[in-house]
Swiss-Prot record:
Its EC number is 5.4.99.12. It catalyses: uridine(38/39/40) in tRNA = pseudouridine(38/39/40) in tRNA. Keywords: Isomerase, tRNA processing. PANTHER family: PSEUDOURIDYLATE SYNTHASE, TRNA PSEUDOURIDINE SYNTHASE-LIKE 1. This is tRNA pseudouridine synthase A. It is an enzyme of class 5 (isomerase). Homodimer. Substrate binds at Y111. GO terms for molecular function: RNA binding; tRNA pseudouridine(38-40) synthase activity. SUPFAM superfamilies: Pseudouridine synthase. Formation of pseudouridine at positions 38, 39 and 40 in the anticodon stem and loop of transfer RNAs.
Amino acid sequence: MHRYALKVEYNGAPFVGWQRQKEHPTIQGAIERALGKIAPGPHTIAAAGRTDAGVHAIAQVAHCDLERDWDPFRLSEALNYHLKPAPIAITACTAVDAEWHARFSARQRQYLFRILCRRAPATHQKGLVWQVKQKLDVTAMREAAALLIGQHDFTTFRSTICQAESPVKTLDRLDVNEVDTPYGREIHFDVRARSFLHNQVRSFVGTLERVGAGSSTPQDVARALALRDRAACGPVCPPHGLYLAHVVYDRPPFEAERSI
């Protein structure tokens, strides 16, 4: 068998998430069906992150195993042909050794969340950002975000249906940045960790948005973290501003990343 790493970009709006489901459209299901068009199946692919319904990806990483020795460029071209018209694209493909695993070899996952601050309805960016009508206090949001960095029990910031064995995670980065775009002022959250709890990033952003709006304070966030109580979390923000932006490996599979 030959193993191939795939870099995958997608708009998550039409899907109930990454993970295959029998009766609902998923990204994993679409890619496995495309593989079935070019090679005998069944096929099961693995991914670095199992994104939820409505969540997008700039650079999800997956791998597949095929009996035939494919040229990576031809494999990506064939998959992209059979994925149409779904909003999924294979943007890079490379052969990897059998020990390399898209999920278990990953050292860090990096997420981007976009908030668009403007009163007029979003048009071009609709479904790609979380739009809020008021200005947000970025300084206060940064102060609150800094309190979440490091190793903590994140019970407050995980879904009640989270299946992780432990709520303890190490958050490597939670940067809050203002960005001027042609569509208006955006606030970008750069969130990085080896792994995340279910709904953790969206819980962070929803809580920090309330700080930016003046409804709560950085001290409230510190208390919520210490309480280890889901009821102390702010509102979970919608999924459509969230992107899996990058996955870090000790041995980056894609040529362009090996010098980073």
